[in-house]
Each structure stands twice: as C-alpha cells, then as structure tokens.
Amino acid sequence: MSHQVIGLHIGSLGSVVGRFKDRVVDVVLSDSSNRQVPTVVSYNDRERNFGDLALQTNKSNFKRTVVYPNRWLGIQKNWPFFEEESKYSNVKPVFDQTGKIGFNINYKGKEDFYSVESLMGLYFSKIKNNWTREGIDTDDIVVSIPDYFTAYERKAMLEAIDISGIKCSALINESSAISLSYGLLRLGQFTDDKDRIVGFVDMGQAKTTIFFGTFNKKEMKVISVNNERFCGAREFDYLIAKHVSNVFEQKYGCDPMSAPKIKIRLMDYIGKIRKTLTVNKETSLNIDSLMDGEDLTYNLTREEFEKIIKPVTDKFRALCEKSVKNLLEKCKIKLEDVHSIEMVGCAVRTPIIQEIIKDIFKKEVCKTLLPDECISRGCTLFAAMNSPYFSVRNFEFHHYNPYTIEVEYPYVKKDGTTIIKRDVLLKQGDNFPKGKDYTFEKSMLVKNNFNVKFYYNKNEIEWLENDLLNAFNINIPGKTEEKSSVKFTFYVDLNCLPSTKTAELTEKYTEEVPVKVVDTEKKEEKKEEKKEEKKEEKKEEKKEEEKKEEIKMKKVDKERVTKLDIKQVDCLFGTAGGILQRLIQKEREQSKEDDLFKKITHRKNSIENYIYSTREKIDSKFKDYILPEEKEKLPKLMDTLYEWLYSEDENIYNLDSLNTKSKDMYTVGDPIYSRYQNWQLLEENINLLEKAILEITEKINNEKKNDKTTILNKDDFDKLDKLIADALKKGKETKEAFDKGDRKKQPPVDQKDIKEYKDNLYINSENVFKDAQKRVDEEKRKKEEEEKKKKEEEEKKKKEEKKEDKKEEEKKEDVEMKDATKEEEKKDTSNAMDVE
C-alpha cells in the first residue's frame, strides 16, 4: 500500500479529514458517510460518543454533551472572553485545583472532572477511526488551529493530540492552510517577477479571520492577519434566538432561552432557517409546542435579520477596515494592488457579509475555494510537504507569527553588576520555525544557574495577564577555564512555541604534550657514510641514534565543547508530565471500554434481531421445517431471553453473559434455520440445473440445424447428448428426492453437490466446444501449411525450370556463337586463298 498523510481541520462547527494519496487530495468520510464530523463530544451511562451520534442526543443529554470543545482549549479564568464563550455551552465550565478548565460530567454513574484536553483527546481518538478504518496508519498528520491561538492554546491542543495517541507532525495556522490550498494548485498561474496579492475572508461558525498573502512561482507568504474571536454564524443564531424569545415571552410569558433543552432546539432550528435567507428574502419560523405547549410562529425578513445581527456585522465591518489599514500601513500595499478576495467558511454566504466585503475591499468576492474543505486540504498538502515519502515542487512558504516573542536572560556588565536583558526573538508577522544564537563570555555569565524566560510582547496582547510562555534553567559549572564561553540557541518551533534548543560550553585551554626531539647532528653524519658499509652496521647505528632521541614537553592550544543540561521549569502552563501520562492511560482504557461496549451492543442487537425474525417465521416460513418439540421449546427460550435483555440485570452488558444466556436459543433455533436454508438452496440449485440443461440443449440443437457451418462432428454430438442425458437423469432423481423429502429433516441431497454438478455441466459442455474449435483450428492450420508447402514447391519448380531454360538458351547462344566463328574463319580462309 502506498504511503498516505492526513490533514485534519478542527473547526467550531465540524471537522474535516483530508488525505494525500497517489498525488490527489480527497476527504475521508465519517462512519455516517458524511464529509464533516460535528465538533461535539458526549457521555452517557455506558459509553462515550462524538460527532453525529453526540449531536443527535444533544437535546436529551445536554448536561453531558460538550459543544465547541476546541473553543475552550487553553482558556484561563481571567481571560476577557471566558464569559462570552460560556453562553454557548450547555455544561457549565469549571476549574480544577491546578487551574485547568474543564467540565463536571456524570459518566457511568460517577461525576468526575474532565479537562478540555481530555475531551478533545476523546474527540481525536474517535475521529482517528475514520482513517484507520480506511487502512491508513501514518505519523504524518497535520492539525489546523486558528491564527489567534496563544502558546497556552497551542500547548493545550498538542496535549489533547498526545492524549488521543495520534502522532502529530505539526500544527498549522488556518491562514497558512488556506494559502497552501489556494496557491499550491495554482503555481502555473503565477509569475517569477511579480507577486500576486490575494485577500482571504474566513468567516466560520464562531470566528472570523481576514488575511492577505503573496504568491509567485517560488514563494508563498502570509503578510497580514487580523482576527475576531467572536464573529460567526452562531452569533447570528444567538441574536435571532434572543429576539424571537423576547417576542415569545411577551406573548406567552415564558422565555425559551432560559430552558437549556428548549434553547438547543430553538438554536438548531434557527441555524437551518438562517441558511434559507441567503437565497430568499423572507422565511417563517414554525415550531410546534416550543414551551409550555405554546407554538412558535414568526415571519422573518432578510431586512429584519440584518437589523438584528447588526452588532456582529458592525464587528465584521470594523475588522475589514482594520485589515485594509494594516495592509497599507504595515505592508505598504494599496487595495488596488490586491488581485482578488477569496471567501472561506460557512458564514460568508450571508448576503450582508458579501455586501460589506464589496464595500470595504472594492472588489467582487471570489468563490474558487471549497469553503468547508479548503483548510483540511491545506493541512494535507503541508503534511505531504513535510513527509519524506512525497516529492513536492521546490518553493518557500512563510507562516505568520501572531504575537511578538521575546527572550529574557541575565547579563553581567563590565562593572560586575547583573542586569536582566530582553531581546526580540521573533517579531509579529515573522516566519517560523526560527532560531537565534547567543554567545556569552565567562565574564558575562551569571554563576551556576542561568535562567532564560520567554514572553509575549505585552503591547500586542494586553488582555493576557501572564505573558510568560516558557522558562529554562541551565546549570553552568562553577569551575571553568579562564577562556570560556557559552553558546545558547533560542528557538521557535513549527508549532510557534519558544524553547532553549541547545546550550554548549566551549573552553579554551593550553595543555603540555610530550614531543620527540631527534639528534640532528647524528643524522647528518649518517648521510655522509659510504655506500659500501654493511647493513648490519647501519642497524647498529640506528639503535644508537634512537637512544639519543629526547622527550620534551610542548604547550598546545586546545578546545573542549560540553553540552549543558537544560531544565524546563515545570508546568508554567499546560499539564504536568505525570498528570498528562495518567490522562493518556485513562483515554486508552476508556477507548477499550468503548470498543467492548460496541461489541456488546452489536451482540445484543444481533440477539434481538434473531428473536424478532424467528418469531415471525415460526408460523410462516418455518411452518413445514420445525419439529413439534422445537416449536414448543424455542418460543419459551426466546421469551425468557427477551425479558432478561430488558431487565435491570447488569449482566446484559457483559459479553460472556450474553453468549451464555443465548446459547440454548441458538442451539434449538440454528438447526431450524439450517434446514430451511438447505431446502431453499436445494430447490434453487435444482432450478438452476434445469435451466442449464435447457440452455445447453438449445445450443446443441442450433448446432445440429447448422450442419454446414458447425464445428462439431458426430463424436462431439455424442458426447454432448450423453452429458444432457446424464444431467436429465440426475435432475429427475434429485427432483423426486426433493418432492418426497421430509422438510423436518435435512435434505436427502446436499445442495452443494447439485450446484457443483451444474457448474461441471457448463464446464464439460464448454470443453467439448473448445476441443472442437481446437480441432478445427488445427485442421485449418495443417491445411494452410500444406497449401503453403505446395505453393513453395511449385515456386521452386518454376524457378528450377526457368534456370534450366536459361541454361539451354545460354548453351544455344554458345553453339550459335561457335558456328558463327567457324563461318567467319572459313570466309577468311577462302578470301586468303583467292588472294594467293
């Protein structure tokens, strides 16, 4: 099987799994055959669900169903949008003792705290089945994240992926994924000398991102990004729901938004109705018995809809204006230089949104991208680019760093005072991954522990109270050489998380080493020796010379490089290592429990279907095939088993108990099914045998009628007639046995034997025709060879006759020439005699 990679877009409304196979990007379908999997997880008394199954039970199981779990990743209690996100949650978010956000959920009769990372770990674990079911086993997996994600949220996403057991090669900003999806498949449209500048508006279920990218044949770059966390389709739905609820409350005195189950029902309905306003100017809301038995009926025009959602559209307009301003001020690019504006996301289809885009950007919107799938496609392409198994066209791609990252370290000045210095490691908008090297001489280093810290720029992200991202302690040896230095590599990785990658101590020192010094005077004397001296004398001379060699010490400059230990400060944010391992183990155990419960449910459903099906057949299809004692015993066994399946006995969820309890029923019932099926198959195969006899007989008769063109001879017809005669006899005997057989016993003839006989009849009859055809072909071949040989012999004879005729002509010509010569000689002799 060829290698494949996976690109996973985790959206607020749903997720899409893309794969790259045979140089084609396509979508992996869910187990419900949908292209998108709802981002929802739920728990019940027996199992955990996600996606479509979790969404289906949202109304009835809302206290244990978490929608938009990815929106809670990494959120801290003091963040300004905590309360805003809470109004979209069915379950109240809480914080544990370590400050981790999560939800108290009752699972299997026990209420427990589940962190958002563990909930997303469940989601990843379940969605992984979508591609493993297709036989895809790969570590080349890329997951998308919103561009505004801080290090807190990025770290939380990575932990959720770790909990699920997925091996993720990288996180990718959604702007990068969209740019790849747009640019990589359009490289042929770009030029080398001029960049194409394209704007993208991504308005989804919960947030909006507007960004610009530049494209040419060699490079793609995201140059400007602006985000709004709360600006999407669900804000539209919430405002409409609030408006309709106010009208309903004024009329009936009850507020639908105050009851969670009714609120969910209303929001779901409005979400469906809202989409109709993209093509219609008016729609009706009709919900039977919404609350306290009262029906909801409301006519909503597009004009009123746009008026109600004005707070959201105002935010969107402000974001568009900010994007244009940043493009001009920071990138020095005017709107007229922008090639086009592409739309992405589920909410950009809203007419008022498209009008605002046209008004601000002065361009018609383009719809060349798949709004719901382009991010997953970009993730998949990025996974292929990073995989060693695929060769992707050579070009550079630049991501966009959302917040400036700074590094802080201690520094000893020349006067001996220690100061804390902070440098910019990665500016906002810079590409990553990226590293910087810092080298400190011994005099500049703080003794023993060297503390390095990474921060966000406070001016860019004012609402983040704790802007510390990471911290490391490097233990520098107290005793080092005088001439020594330490080189640090500070690095921002592909996930946009900073770290201290390496720390190397370089020591320069002088060391005395032994050096051999040879008596050069003796060597000169040896050179002047006469050649006539014997070899033995030379050897003795050499030994004396070695004795005179002296060992002296010489100073040599050397360098020693030592890698220093880098210790990360434990759990500045994120989950501590030990707790994370427990969550990973817990997810594995619960996944096994889910798999076992699926097997139990499947087995339980299989038993129920067996009972329902058998009850219907006992007095109908099985009437002639069931023994009296079986007819008496089997219903009792089924009734007892059925009552047990719907009892409160916990053993109904035990696979061994299900198998044990149902054993007696299958022991009595399976033989009945076996008899019935064998008799039915025997009848079917008898009919097929009769059909085969008729087909072959008709074929033989046609050949007999066409006696001038048939390839069959008398022996062939005799063979076929015998096959048909034997088959008729076999069919007659089997039919008689079938008609006389006792249906309450197994058939007297095995239906497999009749099937095999029928197949052999076809094969043997075909072999007669094939053999006849071979014989005819062989006779034809021999005849052609004889004719060819005869023709060759005739041609050879003609050639020989021509050769003989030619020889005769040549011989005749020679005789005539000789006769002519003799006549000439006679004339010459006669003339000579006359002269004399």
Task: Please place each PLM-identified region on the residue numbering.
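Oxyanion-binding/catalytic loops of NTP- or PPi-dependent enzymes
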Residues: M1-E84, K92-F95, K108-V116, L122, ...
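Short, acidic/hydrophobic/Gly-rich beta-strand patch recurrent on exposed beta strands
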Residues: N104
